């Protein structure tokens, strides 16, 4: 019965008597996730299951259909591949809810072993005891190969013994009879099942039938009613926020007859709906209290702030208007300065020379002088003392000495300085008397200085000392620390200069690296422990991916695991016979014959480690692939070359002998001379010829570069000529450039570290040798050689193709061959054809050139047909053009169209140019290839190696079919779920790298929080995508609130790098999970800087804490924003990002910004700058903006802005007011306001603006102290203060939501007013308000002043120009009159007719479009059959309005002139149309000949229309017509190009239909500001049906169609006719009868009896399309 055990390997065979419990009649499979399947993945089936998400809990569950016993499990992998499962657990369940693991003998969850290396190998496990269950869940843990993350299974569940006794099946009870099939003589059925019980364990099935019928309904004549299918859902009752929609059905399927019952149930269903959230405009919070003054005196500052959080703006609502913070001066009084005395001056001369005199001295209170209420100096300013007390003589003596004495002091001089502290001086003379007869000189100074004080001098500011450093911004890893200083030492005063230099410094901090947790390397297996008698395989792994560092956790789990039994065959008991030694292992059975040379060099400073790595890899390679089919030669080289072992094809060495030989040999020292190794390899292959069918390979191992290239090109050429493949392995820090010389395909150069696992590396080497790591490729070649060197070039082309065939074989790569010149010859056109490699080479050798001029268009069309019809379903498709000159029979436009058709089939197009015309070929190929790098120029083709060209082609062929993209990610994760969100961000980046590679997309990453850090950018070189993925996995979050401005600034620097590729698409993806605190203005500035550099910004919000406004600001299109939950699948999010990047693939580059349209903001509207781009390749998709606008010159014009400040007398109010009207002046710091009492009907507050003003905005605020405000109000306006007009028919404007914030409303007036009244309607508490008006003066804004002479000269010049223009216009008018008289009168061509114009032709006319500026939005135009209409005639349509009078509002005329000279795709630029004319001519009641009037019932108010005039026409409206001149914001928003983006595909048939075509560029037309706007326009609605849906935009278009002669037979009710259709998005059939006089359509019914509807599309020569559409309808 077999060997039973709880854990082990494959049994010798299938146990006897096993029953398969998985049958097609009872089986059900379901899985946790699937990339393939699950379908029915049973053993030996083509169905299989592969897990999509590998996270240790993936599972495949089989429902056996009943509870049973099983004791044997079997698994396989994906058929025909190596994708399988090496380990898995099994869980079982009785009820499908509670699952338990199958346990081993140790009581732990049993680990089952799957097949190794082969998806078709069956691996079974027998259990020691049967398990009872209905549900069996397989929980795979690891794939077959560690580097392959695919988990794929096919399963079997069997019962071999201990099976319960057989259970025979028994029928269940009969079900009730079902409904009768017909109203008369129908049948009814009932059924039963064989499930009570079901047959199991070999039991017999039920006997008898499982279905019975009986006759029912004997036709008594009654018919019960039946419901029709539900109709379409109506539109949502609201345009935003929750509403209701409904649908209906009727009791007509069938209708009740002859007393039959009516239908039961409702005829109407309704359900909630929501088109979108209503926009929520942001509102300011209350101002915070004033902060403390920064200075006690001398002028300080106080601050208060508010936030835009009451409410936060949402769903596209406007941000708050105004400033977030205010500052005020405080304590401006000067600081007190107390006075201080100057030093005493010198004593004066004594007043007498004898007899007792006095002398004095003074001081001044100026050191400093008292100021700002400072205390004056204490004490006196003069000191007097006696002097010369001696007695005077009684008589004079001539010899008595006369001492000198000073005269009085002179006047003080002026102060020595103009500001601050200075001095003044005065002097005296010694002449009162002068000294004589030996008398003494005057005592004391002759001059005196005193202080003086002028105005204060300016004080320049000076910095205080730096403050302390702040804490580091990150806990580990690089961070920033900051410190600050203030400009207060001293603070600048008296107009002094401010401090220079920054007030902030930063420094790097936290040099301690963040902990890095260890990660396991891939498993690597050891050789079997025994060659016979059953050994075991072990596998090991290392904790080095990455190694734990800086305190990080070590890896969890075991380093070594026992694997499965191996070499279980019995050991031989008799001596072996004499034969060549055993050389191989079973593992090499699926590989071809290989003659393989290993060249090993280890000469670096780390040569011991690198050489051991190389030697271990070679040993593992030999162990894995054996030596039967692979024969080996090994050389070791450095400065010299030594052979370790040579080929021996007769008796090849055994695995052990090979391993012993390489293990014994040491590395050779000295410089690495790679040229010598290449020459030795060539010698080895010459000495010992290779086996006939063996592939020749050289694998080079090196850990350093050669001192010089040593002419490697010449050394490797003989190897290439001998068809030897060279694979290079650089171990350690080896420059790849040298290795790329000998291995031209970058995929053939492997860069690894010495710690790389030998098992994984040996597999990578074999994958490159056999090219089995590439996908299925269908590659087509188109060859053309017509230059003077065509013979040599054509041979070169064939050599290149032959090299690709020889290197890549014919298993995974299939070929087609086209040769073209003026004609196209398809030599090989079926990718599904199975050819041998020799057959394919023979096809290439026999290719014959096609002469004459090149017609590349024909080759592209032939290729498109081949790939569409003959390509394999899952293959990568590549088309390569090989040419030596330009295609003279093709133009850029036709090439664009034909290559676009190829790209629709997902074909990557490459081109190779040979010879002297490579530059010209490259210019033409810009219309063919996706990016310039897809063109390969080979000007010096004789010198270029065939292998280099061939491998360059194949390397590019393996790239993804994408344009070049320079892609930067800015990641910020600071929410409460930051770990989960940052993990999703990193995994999304990794998914992009894994899916799309690093060749066509270059990457950069910025991580930001409160600061932005660039982790890597386009200048960072990554050897392969695995290294980049590893780099992304090591990213760490940045702390703090996300500063979007800092992130965008850093991104701007990234896109300024010289490494940004000129032809690459530049993309920034911002991923955040929290609200940003960035200033909106700063953010807009950075966004514009990126847009100026043509950077596409995509915003991705992760989680629930991001605000839509943050993402909306940074993107120029709301479709460029994504929202993702934390459980979003990473691959799906990556695909959504790529789809946004590729959406506008067919658009050209943006043009430069235009000049600003205005020099300043007028009427609240700033100027605009415009840039445009064209739809270069429509078939690739042009789903993006064509026109981009930005605001510019936002400063208000002179004379524009808030009116005021107004005098108190300018504010007046209605009589019943409780407060003065002047309190209505808007003042955010004033807590009072004007209030209206008793809610007076029509009460108001009036503002006299003092002059006529064009008002464009009003603002209101509530009363803060009473917490009262107005929530809605309306306006009236007047020019003279007597006659007031309601603004917009007294439409209510939104007021305030609190008492503190200011609410603004934009208004649109067409004339100036002086008086504005605010009428409160709804309010909170009491109707209290402050108000302000914004407007512009009516006077003309004058240019800068000029001199009188300049003005006079300018005026003369203008008059001359005007006279010339007047003469030209007069001449043109005379010519027009002559034309009219001759053509319309004399020739009889002037009669007007009903209908639109078309020219008489024998084929259908094209559709014509009306120009934007000349189109009008008529709802429906009557269509009148006429025999003939002239080209230049016009149609007039009058629409009658039923208001308070019987007169129509006007007549609208338009006309079209056509061009008969050529059949072409006509666009708006080719149509010459009259400008719409507005006429009051119809007021008289007379209708022009040929016009049609649409009349309406006077009592039918619901169907009446209003048509409002455009702004240009409304200037002449009377006062009462104010309402007609207003264009609402909602209409202005709808009439943009973006409105059509959502609807453009609705004009087309589904993609699967034969008439499907790409985006129809010529129907992109939007309304202009000069057109009529429509209000209350509900009579005609959108036509329902596949061509026009409810989401259709307002895209006016006109079609004209002329039926062919006899195309509508009279027998079918048809007749020759013309049709017109002028519509906004299509017209639905009116509900009223066709003869209702409201339409005036009697006698105008049109029958199209041939077909009900249809569409035809014809391509035109210039690349456009001509489309026709027809349908039948009333009138």
UniProtKB/Swiss-Prot annotation:
TM regions (residue ranges): 1357-1377
Record-annotated TSP type-1 domain positions: 168-220, 224-279, 281-336, 338-393, 403-458, 460-515, 517-572, 1144-1198
Region listing for Disordered, in residue ranges: 567-588, 1463-1491
Assigned keywords, A-Z: Disulfide bond, Membrane, Repeat, Transmembrane, Transmembrane helix
Lineage top rank: taxon: Eukaryota
One Pfam family recorded for the sequence: VWA
Domain F5/8 type C, first and last residues per copy: 11-160, 1192-1336
Extracellular side: 1-1356
Keyword Membrane included in the entry's annotation: yes
GO CC, alphabetical: membrane
Compositional bias of kind Basic and acidic residues: 1463-1480
UniProt membrane topology term: Single-pass membrane protein
Disulfide bonds: 180-216, 184-219, 194-206, 236-273, 240-278, 251-263, 293-330, 297-335, 308-320, 350-387, 354-392, 365-377, 415-452, 419-457, 430-442, 472-509, 476-514, 487-499, 528-566, 532-571, 543-555, 1156-1192, 1160-1197, 1175-1182
PROSITE patterns on file: FA58C_1, FA58C_3, TSP1, VWFA
Topology, Cytoplasmic side: 1378-1675
InterPro entries from the UniProt entry: Compl_asym_regulator, FA58C, Galactose-bd-like_sf, TSP1_rpt, TSP1_rpt_sf, VWF_A, vWFA_dom_sf
Biased composition (Polar residues): 1481-1491
Cell location: Membrane
Domain VWFA residue range list: 595-769, 778-958, 966-1141
Tissue specificity field: Component of the acid-insoluble and acid-soluble organic matrix of the aragonitic skeleton (at protein level).
Protein's recorded name: Coadhesin
């Amino acid at each position: 019965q077999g060997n039973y055990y709880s854990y082990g390997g494959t049994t010798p065979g299938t146990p006897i008597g096993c029953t398969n419990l998985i049958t097609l009649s009872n089986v059900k499979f379901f899985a946790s996730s699937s990339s393939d399947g699950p379908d029915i993945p049973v053993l030996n089936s083509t169905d299989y299951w592969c897990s999509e998400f590998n996270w240790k809990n993936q599972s495949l569950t089989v429902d056996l259909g009943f509870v049973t016993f099983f004791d044997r499990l079997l698994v396989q992998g994906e058929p025909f591949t190596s994708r399988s499962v090496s380990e898995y657990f099994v869980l079982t369940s009785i009820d499908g809810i509670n699952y338990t693991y199958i346990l081993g003998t140790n009581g732990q969850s049993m680990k089952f072993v799957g097949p190794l290396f082969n998806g078709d190998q069956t691996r079974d496990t027998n259990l020691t005891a049967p398990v009872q269950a209905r549900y069996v869940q397989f929980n795979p843990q690891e794939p077959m190969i560690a580097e392959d993350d695919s988990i794929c299974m096919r399963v079997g569940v069997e019962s071999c013994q201990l099976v319960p006794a057989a259970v025979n099946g028994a029928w269940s009870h009969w079900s009730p009879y079902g409904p009768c099939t017909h109203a008369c003589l129908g049948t009814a059925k009932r059924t039963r099942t064989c499930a009570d019980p079901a047959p199991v364990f070999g039991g017999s099935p039920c006997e008898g039938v499982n279905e019975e019928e009986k006759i029912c309904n004997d036709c008594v004549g009654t018919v019960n009613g039946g419901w029709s299918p539900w109709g379409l859902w109506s539109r949502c009752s609201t345009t935003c926020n929750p509403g209701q929609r409904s649908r209906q059905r009727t009791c007509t399927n069938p209708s009740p007859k002859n007393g039959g019952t009516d239908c039961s149930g409702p005829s109407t269903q309704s359900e909630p709906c929501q088109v979108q959230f209503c926009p929520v405009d942001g509102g300011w919070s209350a101002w915070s209290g004033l902060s403390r003054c920064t200075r006690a005196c001398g002028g300080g500052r106080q601050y208060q702030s508010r936030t835009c959080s009451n409410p936060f703006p949402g769903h596209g609502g406007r941000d708050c208007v105004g400033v977030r913070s205010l500052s005020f001066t405080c304590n401006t009084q000067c600081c007190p300065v107390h006075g201080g005395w100057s030093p005493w001056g010198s004593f004066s001369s004594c007043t007498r020379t004898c007899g007792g005199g006095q002398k004095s001295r003074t001081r001044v209170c100026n050191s400093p002088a008292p100021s700002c209420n400072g205390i004056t100096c204490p004490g006196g300013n003069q000191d007097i003392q006696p002097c010369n007390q001696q007695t005077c003589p009684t008589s004079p003596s001539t010899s008595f000495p006369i001492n000198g004495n000073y005269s009085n002091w002179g006047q003080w001089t002026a102060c020595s300085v103009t500001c601050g502290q200075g001095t003044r001086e005065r002097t005296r003379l010694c002449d009162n008397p002068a000294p004589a007869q030996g008398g003494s000189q005057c005592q004391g100074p002759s001059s005196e200085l005193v202080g003086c004080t002028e105005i204060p001098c300016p004080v320049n500011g000076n910095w205080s000392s730096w403050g302390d450093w702040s804490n580091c911004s990150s806990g580990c890893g690089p961070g920033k620390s900051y410190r600050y200083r203030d400009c207060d030492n001293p603070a600048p005063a008296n107009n002094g200069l401010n401090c220079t230099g920054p007030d902030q410094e930063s420094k790097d901090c936290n040099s301690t690296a963040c902990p890095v947790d260890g990660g396991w390397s891939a498993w690597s297996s050891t050789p079997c422990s025994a060659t016979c008698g059953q050994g075991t395989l072990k596998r090991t792994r290392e904790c080095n991916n990455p190694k734990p560092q800086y305190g990080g956790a070590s890896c969890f789990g075991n380093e070594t695991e026992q694997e499965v039994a191996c070499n279980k065959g019995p050991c031989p008991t008799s001596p072996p016979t004499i034969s060549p030694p055993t050389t191989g292992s079973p593992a090499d059975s699926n590989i071809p014959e290989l003659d393989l040379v290993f060249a090993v060099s280890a000469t670096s400073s780390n040569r011991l480690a690198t050489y051991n790595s190389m030697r271990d890899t070679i040993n593992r390679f030999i162990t894995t692939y054996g030596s039967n089919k692979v024969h080996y030669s090994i050389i070791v080289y450095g400065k010299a070359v030594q052979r370790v072992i040579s080929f021996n094809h007769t008796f090849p060495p055994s695995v052990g002998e090979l391993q012993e030989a390489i293990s014994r040999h040491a590395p050779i020292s000295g410089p690495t001379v790679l040229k010598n190794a290449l020459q030795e390899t060539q010698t080895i292959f010459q000495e010992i010829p290779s086996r006939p069918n063996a592939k020749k390979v050289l694998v080079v191992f090196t850990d350093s570069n050669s001192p010089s290239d040593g002419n490697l090109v010449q050394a490797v050429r003989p190897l290439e000529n001998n068809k030897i493949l060279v694979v290079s392995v650089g171990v350690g820090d080896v420059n790849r450039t040298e290795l790329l010389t000998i291995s031209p395909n970058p995929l053939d150069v492997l860069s690894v570290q010495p710690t790389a696992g030998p098992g994984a590396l040996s597999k990578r080497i074999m994958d490159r040798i056999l090219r089995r790591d590439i996908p299925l490729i269908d590659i087509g070649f188109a060859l053309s050689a017509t230059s003077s060197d065509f013979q040599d070039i054509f041979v070169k082309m064939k050599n290149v193709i032959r090299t690709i065939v020889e290197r890549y074989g014919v298993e995974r790569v299939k070929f087609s061959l086209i040769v073209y010149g003026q004609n196209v010859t398809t030599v090989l056109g079926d990718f599904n054809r199975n050819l041998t490699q020799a057959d394919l080479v023979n096809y290439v050798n026999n290719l014959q050139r096609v002469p004459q001029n090149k017609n590349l268009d024909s080759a592209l069309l032939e290729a498109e047909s081949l790939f569409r019809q003959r390509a394999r379903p899952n293959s990568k498709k590549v088309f390569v053009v090989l040419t030596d000159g330009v295609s003279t029979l093709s133009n850029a436009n036709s090439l664009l169209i034909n290559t676009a058709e190829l790209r629709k089939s997902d074909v990557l197009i490459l081109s190779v140019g040979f010879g002297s015309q490579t530059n010209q070929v490259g210019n033409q190929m810009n219309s063919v290839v996706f990016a310039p790098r897809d063109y390969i120029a080979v000007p010096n083709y004789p010198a270029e190696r065939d292998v280099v060209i061939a491998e360059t082609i194949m390397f590019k062929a393996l790239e993804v079919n994408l344009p070049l993209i320079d892609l930067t990610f800015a990641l910020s994760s600071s929410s409460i779920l930051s770990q989960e969100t940052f993990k999703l961000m990193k995994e999304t980046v990794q998914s992009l790298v894994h899916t799309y590679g690093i060749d066509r997309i270059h990457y950069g990453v910025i991580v930001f929080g409160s600061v932005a850090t660039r982790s890597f950018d386009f200048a960072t070189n990554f050897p392969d995508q695995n290294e980049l993925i590893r780099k992304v996995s090591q990213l760490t979050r940045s702390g703090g609130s996300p500063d979007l401005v800092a992130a965008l600034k850093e991104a701007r620097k990234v896109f300024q790098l010289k490494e940004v590729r000129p032809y690459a698409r530049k993309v920034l993806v911002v991923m955040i999970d929290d609200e940003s605190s960035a200033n909106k203005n700063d953010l807009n500035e950075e966004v514009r800087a990126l847009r100026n550099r043509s950077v596409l910004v995509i915003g991705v919000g992760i989680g629930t804490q991001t605000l839509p406004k943050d993402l909306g600001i940074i993107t120029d299109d709301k479709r460029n924003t994504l929202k993702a939950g934390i459980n979003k699948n990473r691959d799906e999010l990556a695909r959504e990002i790529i789809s946004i990047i590729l959406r506008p693939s067919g658009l050209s580059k943006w043009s430069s910004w235009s000049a600003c349209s205005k020099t300043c903001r007028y009427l609240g509207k700033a100027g605009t700058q415009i840039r445009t781009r064209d739809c270069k390749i429509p078939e690739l998709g042009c789903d993006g903006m064509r026109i981009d606008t930005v605001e510019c010159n936002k400063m208000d014009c002179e004379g524009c802005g808030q009116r005021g400040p107004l005098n108190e007398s300018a504010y007046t109010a209605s009589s019943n007011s409780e407060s003065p009207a002047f309190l209505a002046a808007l003042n955010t710091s004033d807590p009072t306001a004007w209030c209206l009492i008793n809610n007076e009907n029509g009460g108001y507050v009036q503002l006299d603006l003092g002059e006529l003003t064009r008002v464009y905005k009003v603002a209101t605020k509530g009363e803060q102290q009473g917490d009262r405000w107005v929530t809605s109000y309306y306006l009236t306006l007047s020019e003279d203060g007597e006659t007031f007009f309601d603004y917009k028919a007294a439409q209510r404007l939104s007021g305030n939501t609190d008492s503190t914030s200011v609410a603004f409303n934009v208004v649109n007036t067409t004339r100036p007013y002086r008086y504005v009244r605010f009428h409160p309607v709804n309010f909170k508490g009491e109707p209290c308000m402050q108000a302000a008006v914004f407007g512009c003066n009516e006077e003309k804004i004058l240019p800068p002043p000029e001199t009188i002479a300049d003005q006079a000269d300018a005026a003369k010049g203008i008059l001359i120009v005007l006279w010339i223009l007047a003469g030209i216009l007069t001449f043109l008018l005379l010519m027009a009159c002559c034309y009219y008289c001759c053509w319309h009168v004399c020739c009889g061509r002037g009669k007007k007719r009903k209908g639109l114009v078309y020219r008489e032709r024998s084929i259908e006319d094209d559709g014509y479009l009306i120009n934007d500026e000349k189109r009008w939005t008529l709802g429906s135009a009557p269509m009148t059959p006429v025999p003939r209409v002239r080209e230049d005639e016009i149609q007039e349509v009058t629409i009658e309005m039923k208001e308070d009078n019987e007169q129509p509002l006007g007549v609208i005329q338009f006309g079209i002139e056509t061009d008969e000279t050529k059949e072409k795709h006509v666009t708006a630029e080719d149509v010459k149309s009259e400008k719409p004319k507005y006429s009051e001519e119809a007021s008289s009641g007379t209708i022009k000949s040929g016009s049609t009037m649409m009349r309406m019932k006077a009592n039918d108010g619901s169907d009446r229309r209003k048509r409002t005039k455009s702004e240009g026409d409304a200037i002449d409206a009377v006062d009462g017509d104010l309402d007609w001149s207003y264009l609402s914001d909602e209409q202005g928003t709808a009439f943009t190009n973006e409105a059509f983006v959502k609807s453009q595909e609705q004009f087309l048939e589904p993609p699967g239909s034969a008439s499907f075509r790409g985006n129809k560029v010529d129907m992109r037309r939007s309304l202009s500001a000069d057109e009529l706007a429509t209000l209350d326009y509900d009579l005609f609605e959108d036509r329902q049906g596949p061509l026009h849906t409810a989401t259709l935009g307002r895209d006016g278009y006109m079609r004209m169609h002329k039926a062919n002669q006899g195309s509508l037979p009279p027998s079918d009710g048809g007749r020759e006719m013309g049709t017109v259709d002028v519509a906004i998005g299509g017209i639905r059939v009116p509900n009223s009868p066709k003869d209702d006089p409201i339409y005036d359509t009697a006698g105008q019914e049109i029958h199209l009896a041939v077909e009900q509807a249809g569409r035809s599309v014809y391509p035109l020569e210039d690349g456009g399309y001509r489309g026709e559409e027809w349908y039948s309808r009333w009138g």
